[in-house]
């Protein structure tokens, strides 16, 4: 009855046409606030500001150096260049002055680095300069200046940015006139700053478009790597032609493609209007903000202290993944010929020009606004019904558990199709539910090979792996290791599995809780407690039968919710499915195979890397993971195991297509509706962003229930398999209790204990800054997974390898895998295969070196089956 109801809801979700949330006509992403005015410069009676100053942040202090202005009355004075340096420390309203540059200069580029503010080029009234120097704010509250290598050419009205320690400079003019604008592109690696002989500027290939000055140079992540973006600018064709050519184009430079010797530049979308002499700044994970443009749009009275300037004050946002541009607000003041800097989580725009000849001493701080979400009663009601239903399943099956065979294996009375859905659900976590669409959204279908490689491997698992576990009638997978090798290997494997699964439970509860808290009004700890407590309740009461049946229901819920989201996204397009295919094809989002066999392909997503890595990642859970192996034993015979594999494979294939399609649909949806993006969300949270703002009330609750379902299915599999291993491999192995009822009570207690422990660890994640330390711990334990699988394969496919050789092989696999991860850039996808291979090869070779006492392995090796 429950299953039919869930199916009905799934179909209902699919046929109802979603109504997108209303889109606001005027977006406003930024909250503006004013900072202390820039003081009067040397020789001037009042603060009037400067244009073209070097601006940057170092040691949590804002530095403004140099610049040029006109004193009042503006129309009767000549431009003045300045050498003043002013510093404003964080949380202070008092400017610190009295510092000087070596000479008066303006209109260079500046970029903030951990080494200091790099000041590049510039000019004065007579000429341009190639000077480059570093300004540092030290602990003694003084400015320290360090000279750096000069530019290859004199350059002013240029712009700079960084990727890591590398400074990039693009655009600018070689002389004082605009007709000297260049197509220059240089870089310098500041990591070599302590090696003066190695520190130098490198000439890079220029973009294919026009030469330019007064452009923006910015860096941002495009879904695959951090790239350089050249935006807008202006140039003059010749000295005789005084007209400016204004630019609205964007070009992207890929450092990875350049390093590989490939064409590195790509033409991107055009801006809605030309921009020049303005500043830009990367925000979030994939946006670049463009502040105004030096195009006169408003009249102003120079004597009016409240005027907002006469240039364009619109703020544009360029999204590097969808290659779209939208207007996202308006500046309070039309500041041009200045530099935007990041100061902690804020963007600071200091001084600048607001009209021809008119500067401003005002400094404005912009903070990103985050839209609040309201989950609503309808969504909460749907989620509550789902959660209560899961507890009801546990209560129902509680009365069917008479002994440990019922609790751990469901009395082997579970249907094959339900066991198959349980295998699928155990492998699919809510991290996958969120992460796979996000990965496809920012890239393409290259990773689909990892998921589909299970199809040719499943027959191997059924024919060559399952028979060993069925023959010994295993409750714990690690019983096989004792029978084939020795008790030490069994206990070592069991203990490692328990540690890994406890940590995995904590992560599987914590990471989805972060996403769920953004979609609901619940806090992260509340989301963790809901997942943990409810899962522990139905697992403790109902045993494996409750786990398997809730897995089956959860599979239908999560796939139904996912299908509905896909339907809403495609339905939002004017052209429907055909437009979806068209936009996705234009963006190469269906690209699935990377035919790269070069020497460096081992570091990439090359097809052969995906195949070999996919084989290892598939073998590990199906050969050595108790949570999966346990499902082989919940049905009554081998034929039903085969049918469960067929069900699992079909469900996995369908889910793969759905989730990869969702990732592509997210790209298409946000390319068609870029105004619905929120820069405060990370790319990994793009699916939760869609769920939060684009789904109607009530139906959003079903999708949230799907995410909970994915989390609970993984947690339930972990907590129940831990209980199975502890009772079977430790308590029963050493006959710690006397009655079957005692073992059943111990099983329930272990389920409760380890489920609670995993929940507590997840709560610690949410309340303490130990995430990186814990991830390192899990990474170390994760090194055991490949070699652990290798132990089983050594036992099943060799007859000469004994316990000592097997242990040496496993330890060698861990060490080799650690070295590979620490000292190479090999794609992490290959880690599982590398660990398996190292364990098998070393273990087999050691069997020729170490003589071991022969033991009866009849039925435990392929040679004696």
Q: Language-model features: where?
A:
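Intrinsically disordered, low-complexity regulatory regions of eukaryotic regulatory proteins
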Residues: 21-24, 623
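Membrane-embedded helix-loop-helix hairpins and adjacent transmembrane boundary segments
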Residues: 371-865
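Short, intrinsically disordered low-complexity segments
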Residues: 3, 89, 210-211, 233, ...
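Bacterial N-terminal signal peptides
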Residues: 8-18
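Generic short N-terminal amphipathic or hydrophobic helices
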Residues: 2, 14-15, 856, 861
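Bacterial N-terminal signal peptides that target proteins for export
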Residues: 1-8
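Kelch-like beta-propeller repeat domains
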Residues: 23-375
């Amino acid at each position: 009855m429950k299953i039919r109801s869930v199916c009905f809801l799934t179909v209902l979700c699919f046929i109802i046409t979603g109504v997108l949330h209303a889109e606001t006509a005027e977006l406003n992403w930024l909250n503006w606030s004013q900072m202390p005015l820039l003081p009067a410069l040397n020789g001037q009676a009042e603060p009037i500001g400067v244009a073209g100053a070097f601006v940057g942040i170092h040691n949590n202090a804002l530095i403004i150096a140099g610049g040029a202005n006109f004193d009042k009355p503006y129309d009767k004075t000549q431009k003045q260049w300045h050498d003043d340096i002013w510093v404003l420390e964080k949380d202070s309203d008092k400017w610190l002055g009295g510092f000087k540059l070596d000479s008066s200069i303006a209109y260079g580029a500046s970029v903030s680095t951990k080494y200091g503010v790099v000041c590049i080029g510039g000019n004065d009234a007579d000429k341009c300069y190639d000077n480059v120097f570093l300004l540092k704010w030290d602990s003694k509250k003084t400015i320290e200046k360090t000279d750096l290598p000069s530019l290859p050419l004199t350059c002013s009205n240029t712009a700079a940015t960084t990727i890591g320690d590398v400074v990039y400079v693009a655009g600018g003019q070689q002389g004082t006139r605009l007709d000297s604008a260049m197509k220059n592109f240089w870089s310098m690696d500041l990591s070599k700053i302590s090696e003066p002989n190695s520190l130098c500027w490198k000439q890079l290939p220029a973009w294919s478009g026009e030469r330019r000055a007064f452009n923006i140079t910015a860096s941002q992540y495009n879904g695959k790597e951090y790239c350089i973006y050249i935006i807008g600018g202006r140039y003059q064709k010749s000295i005789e032609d005084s007209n400016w050519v204004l630019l609205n184009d964007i070009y992207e430079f890929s450092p990875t493609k350049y390093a590989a010797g490939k064409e590195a530049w790509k033409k991107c979308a055009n801006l809605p209007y030309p921009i020049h002499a303005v500043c830009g700044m990367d925000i979030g994970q994939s946006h670049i903000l463009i502040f105004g443009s030096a195009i006169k749009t408003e009249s102003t009275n120079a004597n009016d202290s409240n005027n907002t300037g006469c240039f364009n004050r619109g703020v544009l946002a360029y999204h590097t993944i969808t290659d779209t541009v939208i207007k996202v607000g308006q500046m309070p003041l039309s500041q041009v010929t200045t530099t935007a800097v990041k100061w902690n989580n804020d963007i600071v725009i200091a001084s600048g020009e607001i009209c021809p000849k008119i500067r401003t001493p005002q400094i404005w701080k912009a903070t990103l606004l985050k839209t609040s979400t309201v989950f609503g009663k309808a969504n909460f009601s749907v989620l509550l019904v789902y959660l209560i239903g899961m507890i009801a399943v546990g209560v129902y099956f509680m009365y069917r558990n008479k002994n440990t065979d019922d609790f751990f294996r469901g009395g082997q009375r579970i249907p094959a199709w339900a066991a198959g859905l349980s295998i699928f659900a155990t492998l699919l976590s809510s991290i996958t539910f969120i992460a796979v669409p996000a990965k496809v959204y920012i890239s393409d279908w290259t990773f689909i090979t990892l998921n589909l490689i299970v199809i040719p491997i499943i027959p191997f698992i059924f024919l060559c792996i399952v028979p060993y576990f069925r023959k010994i009638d295993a409750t714990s997978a690690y019983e096989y290791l004792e029978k084939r090798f020795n008790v030490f290997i069994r206990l070592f494997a069991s203990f490692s599995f328990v540690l890994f699964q406890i940590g995995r439970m904590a992560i599987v509860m914590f990471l989805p809780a972060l996403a769920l808290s953004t979609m609901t009004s619940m806090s992260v700890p509340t989301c963790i407690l809901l997942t943990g407590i409810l899962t522990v309740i139905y697992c403790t009461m109902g045993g494996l039968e409750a786990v398997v049946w809730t897995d089956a229901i959860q599979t239908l819920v999560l796939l139904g919710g996912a299908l509905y989201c896909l339907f809403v996204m495609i339905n939002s397009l004017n052209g429907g499915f055909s437009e979806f295919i068209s936009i996705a094809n234009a963006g190469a989002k269906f690209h699935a195979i990377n035919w790269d066999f070069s020497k460096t392909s081992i570091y990439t997503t090359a097809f052969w890397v995906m195949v070999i890595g996919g084989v290892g990642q598939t073998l590990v859970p199906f050969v050595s993971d108790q949570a999966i192996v346990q499902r082989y034993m919940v049905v009554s015979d081998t034929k039903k195991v085969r049918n469960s594999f067929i069900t699992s494979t079909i469900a996995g294939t369908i889910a793969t297509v759905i989730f990869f399609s969702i990732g592509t649909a997210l790209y298409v949806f946000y390319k068609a509706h870029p105004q619905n993006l929120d820069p405060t969300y990370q790319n990994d949270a793009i699916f939760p962003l869609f769920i939060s703002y684009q789904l109607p009330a009530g139906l959003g609750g079903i999708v949230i229930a799907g995410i909970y379902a994915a989390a609970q299915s993984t947690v339930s599999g972990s907590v129940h398999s831990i209980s199975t291993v502890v009772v079977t491999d430790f308590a029963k192995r050493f006959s710690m209790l006397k009655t079957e009822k005692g073992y059943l009570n111990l099983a329930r207690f272990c389920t409760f204990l380890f489920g609670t422990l995993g929940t507590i660890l997840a709560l610690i994640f949410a309340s303490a800054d130990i995430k990186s330390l814990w991830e390192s711990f899990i990474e170390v334990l994760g090194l055991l997974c490949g070699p652990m699988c290798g132990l089983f394969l050594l036992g099943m496919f060799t007859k000469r390898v004994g316990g000592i050789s097997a242990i040496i092989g496993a330890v060698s696999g861990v060490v080799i895998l650690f070295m590979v991860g620490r000292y190479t850039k090999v794609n992490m996808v290959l880690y599982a295969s590398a660990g398996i291979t190292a364990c098998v090869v070393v273990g087999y070779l050691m069997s020729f070196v170490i003589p071991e006492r022969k033991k009866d392995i009849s039925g435990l090796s392929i040679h004696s089956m």
